[in-house]
């Protein structure tokens, strides 16, 4: 290889090895490195969903908690698991770097899994058994037992906070957007990334859930713990092949500086003279594998932060690029807010949807019964099929009409997912109304622990539709927040996606408790321990209306959203999307 060829072989996006040396694309990165990351994600998702998918069943049958309390405990924990990535993104972007942050978080994650497995195994800290189907008559778990169990759960949540935002960004960092070939490969990365996630989830929702229901919780939690150990080992084996990006400073501090500086100069007269605004020379950015961002007309009040007036203190004067990066993170907030409602719908899968399944006939054959939580596997299976069809069929067809390499824009893809969510809750409401009719027809409304003469597969449509919705909304959401985030804030951008799920779960807890209390005071409660006495159909119909209102707000947000564009080879895709939204 000639000197010129060696020079061209080095990445142009500022990626380095762990020692900080420039890296060659023929040795590190691309799909060779991503293969370790993707396989890690398969096993890690198997571990995580091996716990979360059946957690509602464990809390109702082993901790002897009621429907509302169990649902809220699950959604509060899941919400925390999705919220801690904000802290993980901060540490990865500003302090330790993504790789080191990820490895330390893996150790915390694994310790939580180990203690959780012990909490369902050792007699002294394992909750007492109960033979009755009425949880109100069962002996409650002791304070010590609850402390160990929930302590392990939330330790696990802290660990995932450092892994979730950094692992997907590490994977995306393996592709240099300045190289046309790697730029093209990166366009499909998020689709296959989600494919790996839901493949691991499918195994958890089927095999692991069956083991937990039919063999025991010790093995049922021990296998996910082993899976996590395997996933961490696989990731570490790929270390010689990874590209890394150096920490670029706290994105939160950078955004705070811009906001503070703009308020300090609130009375300063504005100008359109570009020389009046502070910016570093282009060479400063090139040395870091970055580039300056030109001023944009939106959120003009923030431009004062880079106005050359007053002192040059960093909390009084920012660069134009820092201002534009802050603008972009703020511009994405309305889109983030729109995703909260569909995230609430996802929270129903492993709580109320599963609770419905416990009341139905679960027999598939004479001797085999499907665990209620395994219905979540149909969400996964539906999504896997939908992603492949989307990537291989839908994109190719729509690309011919739109000229967009993605087929349609990311926001258009989100919009289709939002329409699916309206349909899902209508279908769920109709199905629940039919389930209540079957209970009434057979005189089983006031019976607990008795299975209705209705197959559990009556719930299948709402699970399948949820998977189809995810193939549009969840994939687009992850890619949108990564793609639209500035280069120095990619992990923070990715954490927007996890924040959406966190807030959605917390909102689900709040709404479930509120609706349950209000409806009980006004007569027949909508959500009771005995679902046959509840009106879950009304609750789902309320969700359908909520999704419809949310979709209308989404249309307003899309109308005013301006896509981010940067001076890189990857701008081609964004230019097409900007033209389509004009």
Swiss-Prot record:
It comes from Arabidopsis thaliana. It is found in: Membrane. The keyword NAD does not apply. The chain crosses the membrane at residues 77-97, 100-120, 141-161, 189-209, 217-237, 334-354, 370-390, 408-428, 452-472, 493-515, 538-558. Belongs to the major facilitator superfamily. Proton-dependent oligopeptide transporter (POT/PTR) (TC 2.A.17) family. One of its GO terms (molecular function) is tripeptide transmembrane transporter activity. Induction: By wounding, salicylic acid, abscisic acid, methyl jasmonate, salt treatment and amino acids histidine, leucine and phenylalanine. No induction by glutamic acid, methionine or tryptophan. Expressed in roots. Detected in shoots, leaves and flowers. It holds the Pfam family PTR2. The keyword Transmembrane helix applies. InterPro entries: MFS_trans_sf, NRT1/PTR, POT_fam. Peptide transporter involved in stress tolerance in seeds during germination and in defense against virulent bacterial pathogens. GO terms for biological process: defense response to bacterium; dipeptide transport; hyperosmotic salinity response; response to abscisic acid; response to histidine; response to jasmonic acid; response to L-leucine; response to phenylalanine. It is a multi-pass membrane protein. PANTHER family: OLIGOPEPTIDE TRANSPORTER-RELATED. One of its GO terms (cellular component) is membrane. The gene is NPF5.2. This is Protein NRT1/ PTR FAMILY 5.2. Keywords: Membrane, Transmembrane, Transmembrane helix. It comes from the Eukaryota.
């Amino acid at each position: 290889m000639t000197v010129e060829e060696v020079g061209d072989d080095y990445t142009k996006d500022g990626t380095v090895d762990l020692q900080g040396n420039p890296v060659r694309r023929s040795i590190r990165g691309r799909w060779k490195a991503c293969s370790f990351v993707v396989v890690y994600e398969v096993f890690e998702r198997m571990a995580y969903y091996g716990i979360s998918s059946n957690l509602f069943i464990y809390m109702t049958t082993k901790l002897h908690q009621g429907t509302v309390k169990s649902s809220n405990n699950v959604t509060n924990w899941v919400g925390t698991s999705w919220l801690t990535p904000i802290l993980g993104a901060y540490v990865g972007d500003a302090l330790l770097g993504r790789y080191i942050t990820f490895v330390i978080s893996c150790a915390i994650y694994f310790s939580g899994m180990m203690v959780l497995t012990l909490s369902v195994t050792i007699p002294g800290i394992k909750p007492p058994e109960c033979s009755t189907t009425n949880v109100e008559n069962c002996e409650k778990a002791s304070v010590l037992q609850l402390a160990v169990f929930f302590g392990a759960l939330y330790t696990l949540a802290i660990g995932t906070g450092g892994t979730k935002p950094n692992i997907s960004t590490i994977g995306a960092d393996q592709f240099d957007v300045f190289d046309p070939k790697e730029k093209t490969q990166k366009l499909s990365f998020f689709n296959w990334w989600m494919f790996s996630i839901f493949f691991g989830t499918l195994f958890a929702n089927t095999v692991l859930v069956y083991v937990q229901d039919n063999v025991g919780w010790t093995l049922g939690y021990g296998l996910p713990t082993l899976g996590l150990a395997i996933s961490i080992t696989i990731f570490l084996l790929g270390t010689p092949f990874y590209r890394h990006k150096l920490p670029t400073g706290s994105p939160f501090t950078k955004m705070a500086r811009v906001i503070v500086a703009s308020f300090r100069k609130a009375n300063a007269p504005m100008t359109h003279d570009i020389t009046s605004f502070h910016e570093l020379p282009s060479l400063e950015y090139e040395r870091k594998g970055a580039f300056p961002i030109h001023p944009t007309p939106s959120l003009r009040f923030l431009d004062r932060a880079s106005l050359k007036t007053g002192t040059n203190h960093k909390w009084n004067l920012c660069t134009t690029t820092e201002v534009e990066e802050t603008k972009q993170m703020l511009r994405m907030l309305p889109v983030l807010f729109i995703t909260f409602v569909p995230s609430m719908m996802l929270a129903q899968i492993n709580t109320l949807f599963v609770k419905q399944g416990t009341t139905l006939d679960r027999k598939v054959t004479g001797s085999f019964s499907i665990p209620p939580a395994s219905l979540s596997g149909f969400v996964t299976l539906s999504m896997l099929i939908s992603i492949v069809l989307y990537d291989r069929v839908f994109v190719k067809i729509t690309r011919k009409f739109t000229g967009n390499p993605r087929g349609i824009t990311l926001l258009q893809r989100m919009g289709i997912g939002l329409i699916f969510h309206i349909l899902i809750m209508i279908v769920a409401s109709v199905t629940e109304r039919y389930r209540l009719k079957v209970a009434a027809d057979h005189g089983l409304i006031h019976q607990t622990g008795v299975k209705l003469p209705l197959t559990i597969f009556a719930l299948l449509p709402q699970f399948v539709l949820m998977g189809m919705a995810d193939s549009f909304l969840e994939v687009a959401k992850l890619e949108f927040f990564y793609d639209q985030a500035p280069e120095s804030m990619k992990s923070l951008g990715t954490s927007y996606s996890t924040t959406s799920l966190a807030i959605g779960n917390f909102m689900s807890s709040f709404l479930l408790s509120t609706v349950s209390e209000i409806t009980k005071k006004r007569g027949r409660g909508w959500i009771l321990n005995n679902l046959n006495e509840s009106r879950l159909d009304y609750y789902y119909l309320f969700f359908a209306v909520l999704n419809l209102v949310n979709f209308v707000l989404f249309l307003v947000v899309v109308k005013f959203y301006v896509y981010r564009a940067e001076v890189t080879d990857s701008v081609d895709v964004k230019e097409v999307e900007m033209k389509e939204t004009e």
